[in-house]
């Protein structure tokens, strides 16, 4: 929560990840596993809100915040990019719960996901919400447990004809691909670049027409 409040104070937009808990509530965290950030070998989707409150971030007094608490703390003062983290085919419930929560947020926001099912759900059920397709080169990703066909389809954004995203978000180092050029000139989709680590990357991305997502520096 401290990082979100700092971004609010600096007037920076925020990109955050949302997970669906066992009790149907939402929490904000990057990984599904709590191991890297708390040392506990448990997945966030297997916990209730009450159980999650027992885990602290590394050696701090900070806990993993509920999505509702983050929205209340920000008070609509900064724009949000909300990434949906789908696990075990929970995409419909995750999408529905997130959209219902965002309906009460006074600021501007958009929603994105690596999972095209989430993007398609938004297109069919909440076309009023700006939606984005996140992707990487899945052939270079060690964590991608997918078939060759799915790696090809997701890397080259073939499913965009179904999901029709308003923007595509691609890893900065992999942004110069044929599929991104197709998205720019054929689909006319806005492009977003993540995650920029320094001012040089930030300036290059902006000059090339990408909306920047950055961390660990102030542009």
Predicted regions and their residues:
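Phosphate-group recognition and catalysis centered on beta-loop-alpha active-site segments
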Residues: 1-219
């Amino acid at each position: 929560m401290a990082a979100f409040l700092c971004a609010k104070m600096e007037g920076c937009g925020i990109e955050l990840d949302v997970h669906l808990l066992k009790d149907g509530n939402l929490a904000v965290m990057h990984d599904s596993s709590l191991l890297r950030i708390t040392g506990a070998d448990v997945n966030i989707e297997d916990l209730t809100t009450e159980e999650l409150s027992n885990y602290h971030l590394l050696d701090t007094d900070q806990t993993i915040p509920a999505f509702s608490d983050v929205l209340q703390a920000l008070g609509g003062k900064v724009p949000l990019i909300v990434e949906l983290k789908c696990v075990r085919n929970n995409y419909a419930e995750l999408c529905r719960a997130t959209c219902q929560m965002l309906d009460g947020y006074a600021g501007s926001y958009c929603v994105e996901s690596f999972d095209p099912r989430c993007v398609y759900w938004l297109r069919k059920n909440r076309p009023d919400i700006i939606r984005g397709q996140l992707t990487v080169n899945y052939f270079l990703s060690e964590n991608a447990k997918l078939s060759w066909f799915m790696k090809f389809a997701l890397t080259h954004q073939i499913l965009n004809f179904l999901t029709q995203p308003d923007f595509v978000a691609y890893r900065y180092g992999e942004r110069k691909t044929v599929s991104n050029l197709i998205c720019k000139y054929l689909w006319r989709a806005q492009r977003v670049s993540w995650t920029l680590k320094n001012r040089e990357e930030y300036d290059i991305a902006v000059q090339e027409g990408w909306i920047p997502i950055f961390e660990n520096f102030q542009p």
